């Protein structure tokens, strides 16, 4: 699993998850920053892709690979690790330190049956 994130006030905001499965476990910490927020449209298939790519290019949003503990240069392509979004999402585990869930974070995630 990989995570797109941004840093706000020293805390990580998860903007997107990437995985082949249908479950996401948001870590309590990304790249040394506590995860306190799930961004708007994080699991929605209706995210503004142009804005997101612009933020990736400007390094406002970064990609983190927990397996290596390192940042990646670009967004994974769908064949390597697809975005976990929309009808694909069935289970999401949130960290205890999460304080905010952004607007439409689970928009059209109609298969979502478990949120922990």
Predicted regions and their residues:
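Consensus positions within tandem repeat domains that build extended binding/scaffold surfaces
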Residues: 41-42, 102-107
